[in-house]
C-alpha cells in the first residue's frame, strides 16, 4: 500500500513536471522578446570597459540609451573613433568637436613606493589592467588600461595618478589603408625572359 502510494506520487510529480515544462517551453517560444539589433551593434562598437564615465552602469545600458536617442559622445575611453563609428552606424553626422582627432590617451600609473597592496584598485579595474597581490606592490599593464580612472578614488594612499601616453614610433597607431599598399613583385624571371628573348 505504501509502495503504491509512493509510485503514484512519483508518477504524478513526473507528469506535472512534463506538463509545466511543456507550458514553459511553449511560452518561451511564443512570448520571446526580440532584442533590438541596433543595440547589439552599438554595444559591439563600445570598448566594453564598463567604466561608467558615460553616466550609465555599463556599455550595454549606454548602447540602449544611444538607440533611444541619447548623445553618442559620452564614451570617454572610446574617444573620437567610437563616436565616428556609432554615427556611421546610426546614419547621422558625427558631432564636431574642438579637439582634432582623439584626445591624448591616459593610463593609470601607480607610485610603487607608496602602494600598500590593499588590492582596492584591482577590485575597481573593469579590464584587469592592474596586477599584484594582497600586501604586495601593484602595477599597471599600460596596453590594457583604458584610462577610465575608476582605480583612482578607492586608493587609500593616493598613489595612483593618470598620465598621458606619449606617442612614439613604437606605440603610435599607424593608420593606413591596406588597399593603397603597393605589392612587391619579383620581376627577375620576367627580366630573364626579356633578356633571352622568349
UniProtKB/Swiss-Prot annotation:
Single annotated GO MF: 4 iron, 4 sulfur cluster binding
Top-level taxon of the source organism: Bacteria
Binding site for [4Fe-4S] cluster 2: 115, 118, 121, 155
Cofactor(s) named in the record: [4Fe-4S] cluster
Subcellular location: Cell inner membrane
Chain spans, region Hydrophobic: 1-28
A Pfam family it matches: Fer4_21
Domain 4Fe-4S: 34-92
Keywords tagged on the record: 4Fe-4S, Cell inner membrane, Cell membrane, Electron transport, Iron, Iron-sulfur, Membrane, Metal-binding, Repeat, Translocase, Transport
Predominant location: membrane
UniProt-listed Gene3D superfamilies: 3.30.70.20, Electron transport complex subunit B, putative Fe-S cluster (1.10.15.40)
Enzyme class, broadest EC rank: translocase
EC number from the UniProt entry: 7.-.-.-
UniProt-annotated binding residues for [4Fe-4S] cluster 1: 51, 54, 59, 75
Cofactor note: Binds 3 [4Fe-4S] clusters.
One BP term from GO: electron transport chain
GO CC entries: plasma membrane
Domain 4Fe-4S ferredoxin-type: 106-135, 136-165
UniProt: [4Fe-4S] cluster 3 binding residues: 125, 145, 148, 151
Subunit-structure text: The complex is composed of six subunits: RnfA, RnfB, RnfC, RnfD, RnfE and RnfG.
Job description of the protein: Part of a membrane-bound complex that couples electron transfer with translocation of ions across the membrane.
Record family assignment: Belongs to the 4Fe4S bacterial-type ferredoxin family. RnfB subfamily.
Protein name (record): Ion-translocating oxidoreductase complex subunit B
Organism: Pasteurella multocida (strain Pm70)
Amino acid at each position: 500500500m505504501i509502495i503504491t502510494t509512493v509510485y503514484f506520487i512519483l508518477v504524478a510529480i513526473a507528469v506535472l513536471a512534463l506538463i509545466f515544462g511543456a507550458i514553459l517551453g511553449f511560452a518561451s517560444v511564443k512570448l520571446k522578446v526580440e532584442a533590438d539589433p541596433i543595440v547589439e551593434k552599438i554595444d559591439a562598437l563600445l570598448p566594453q570597459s564598463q567604466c561608467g564615465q558615460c553616466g550609465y552602469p555599463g556599455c550595454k545600458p549606454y548602447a540602449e540609451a544611444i538607440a533611444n536617442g541619447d548623445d553618442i559622445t559620452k564614451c570617454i575611453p572610446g574617444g573620437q573613433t567610437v563616436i565616428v563609428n556609432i554615427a556611421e552606424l546610426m546614419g547621422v553626422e558625427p558631432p564636431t568637436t574642438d579637439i582634432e582627432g582623439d584626445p591624448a590617451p591616459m593610463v593609470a600609473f601607480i607610485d610603487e613606493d607608496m602602494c600598500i597592496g590593499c588590492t582596492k584598485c584591482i577590485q575597481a579595474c573593469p579590464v584587469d589592467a592592474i596586477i599584484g597581490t594582497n600586501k604586495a606592490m601593484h602595477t599597471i599593464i599600460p596596453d590594457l588600461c583604458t584610462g577610465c580612472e575608476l582605480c583612482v578614488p578607492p586608493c587609500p594612499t593616493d598613489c595612483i595618478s593618470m598620465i598621458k601616453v606619449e606617442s612614439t614610433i613604437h606605440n603610435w597607431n599607424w593608420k593606413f589603408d591596406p588597399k593603397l599598399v603597393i605589392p612587391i613583385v619579383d620581376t627577375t624571371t620576367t627580366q630573364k625572359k626579356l633578356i633571352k628573348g622568349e
